[in-house]
Amino acid sequence: MTKVLNKYSRRLTEDKSQGASQAMLYGTGMNDNDMHKPQIGIASVWYEGNTCNMHLNQLAQFVKNSVEKENLKGMRFNTIGVSDGISMGTDGMSYSLQSRDLIADSIETVMSAHWYDGLVSIPGCDKNMPGCMMALGRLNRPGFVIYGGTIQAGVMRGKPIDIVTAFQSYGACLSGQISEQERQETIKKACPGAGACGGMYTANTMACAIEALGMSLPFSSSTPATSVEKVQECDKAGETIKNLLELDIKPRDIMTRKAFENAMVLITVMGGSTNAVLHLLAMASSVDVDLNIDDFQEIANKTPVLADFKPSGKYVMADLHAIGGTPAVMKMLLKAGMLHGDCLTVTGKTLAENLESVADLPEDNTIIHKLDNPIKKTGHLQILKGNVAPEGSVAKITGKEGEVFEGVANVFDSEEEMVAAVEEGKVKKGDVIVIRYEGPKGGPGMPEMLKPTSLIMGAGLGQDVALITDGRFSGGSHGFIVGHIAPEAYEGGMLALLENGDKITIDAINNVINVDLSDQEIAQRKAKWQAPKQKATRGTLKKYIKTVSSASTGCVTDLD
């Protein structure tokens, strides 16, 4: 008996009572034969205004061509996206994190309303990645992700530069390290074309996580956007989705607890973004996998940082592609017993089977350190708790900035206030910069603090100050930084009670973040505190404030 592959779409295409549905489909150009084909949603996060996304419609066409070669019907549709790089440092960043959930909602909506049988998602930028994955998890129909790919490095005066060079150029100009002419040259040459920001920033971090989860094809995360190999990956989409339909392999068969452990190990080895904590928690929630913030610390305790990627290192993802790509790194980790090789993937094979034919990393490569010579012996993503963050916080500690910082609070109620203080020379060595009311509800949208961290680094203060916030950090942020502090200030968390001059200790060895105040002093301040007004009174951000959960649970919007 032939297996039914159009088990969803046939509800519309083969039911005589759905004549209007069929009339509209005939109107799109479908014929009698098409009406019996499985329909595959092709969700492209395309828009022109961002290097990460500008080429995705072209990739979607390649995917559609591949799908239709397999006697399937490809149905392209679009969803929204927000460029973190463009909105960074402005109120527009409030829309970034919530775009993740809007992407998931919109893909779920189109797929469910139109009864598509499978899904190929094509994300390009930071929040695109988990948004597409959350939709796949909720729907639990055969599907996978094709990453839009990484950008090539820019070149200025013979040296490689990237988006973070552009971010840091303003601080460097303020401090006299570069001229205005050099700053202008930097911003014009940092992004040479299509592709996501090139270092181990959030998009590449999440692409690695998705590949380790088994939800993208091998090499997807490290293949550059404009390469022949990215087109070849799209050409495999048809046979891949048809195989998933025939074997009835669904996301929840792949996105298991062990698969999430693989993802956490890989992003740690790669020196990935703090945003991975939020996004993996949200992705796990979409498939009902029990994952919590403390699981990241368990992985960090036994997993080294091996990759020398920007922002704290010197290489970009295209460099890894040239020496074997992400699968070569995973093969090394599998040999060392650090990955679960028996996890199922979208190829229909296990992770170990996918890696059998992959070449080893070159012995003399300088991008990925050997296990006996790590950049940092334990993970860089550290979960800190204490009276400043009872529910937890996420620190990005590579080791280059030290592991303990003691200083005095310099408190700001917004990112803009802090930026002005740096410009006016009011941030000094020994400060623990506190940026509060920038959490999921308070921000709203938990905006990223790349502009402040870039100013700090550009001004030469990276080794001398720390920054803590209930907001997030870009994958491009580095320095002594702690974000995701929960509870957030807007909900009366400890950040709301801090005052200038308070002594704060950040200890990434013992995973503690504390302020030197007695319980009585904290209670007295709490009694005087008044909640601020919501920053959004209408529209999508108003709804986000009402529905978003704490950073410690992934900032999801569909919890009970």
Swiss-Prot record:
Keywords: 2Fe-2S, Amino-acid biosynthesis, Branched-chain amino acid biosynthesis, Iron, Iron-sulfur, Lyase, Magnesium, Metal-binding. GO terms for molecular function: 2 iron, 2 sulfur cluster binding; dihydroxy-acid dehydratase activity; magnesium ion binding. SUPFAM superfamilies: IlvD/EDD N-terminal domain-like, LeuD/IlvD-like. GO terms for biological process: isoleucine biosynthetic process; L-valine biosynthetic process. Pfam families: ILV_EDD_C, ILVD_EDD_N. Mg(2+) binds at residues 84, 126-127, 448. Binds 1 [2Fe-2S] cluster per subunit. This cluster acts as a Lewis acid cofactor. The keyword Lyase applies. Signal peptide: none annotated. Its EC number is 4.2.1.9. Its cofactor is [2Fe-2S] cluster; Mg(2+). InterPro entries: DHAD_IlvD/Edd, Dihydro-acid_dehy_C, DihydroxyA_deHydtase, DiOHA_6PGluconate_deHydtase_CS, ILV_EDD_C, ILV_EDD_N, IlvD/EDD_N. Pathway: Amino-acid biosynthesis; L-isoleucine biosynthesis; L-isoleucine from 2-oxobutanoate: step 3/4; Amino-acid biosynthesis; L-valine biosynthesis; L-valine from pyruvate: step 3/4. It catalyses: (2R)-2,3-dihydroxy-3-methylbutanoate = 3-methyl-2-oxobutanoate + H2O; (2R,3R)-2,3-dihydroxy-3-methylpentanoate = (S)-3-methyl-2-oxopentanoate + H2O. [2Fe-2S] cluster binds at residues 52, 125, 197. The modification N6-carboxylysine is found at residue 127. The active site is at residue 474. The keyword tRNA-binding does not apply. Coiled coil: none annotated. Belongs to the IlvD/Edd family. Functions in the biosynthesis of branched-chain amino acids. Catalyzes the dehydration of (2R,3R)-2,3-dihydroxy-3-methylpentanoate (2,3-dihydroxy-3-methylvalerate) into 2-oxo-3-methylpentanoate (2-oxo-3-methylvalerate) and of (2R)-2,3-dihydroxy-3-methylbutanoate (2,3-dihydroxyisovalerate) into 2-oxo-3-methylbutanoate (2-oxoisovalerate), the penultimate precursor to L-isoleucine and L-valine, respectively. Homodimer. This is Dihydroxy-acid dehydratase. It comes from Francisella philomiragia subsp. philomiragia (strain ATCC 25017 / CCUG 19701 / FSC 153 / O#319-036).
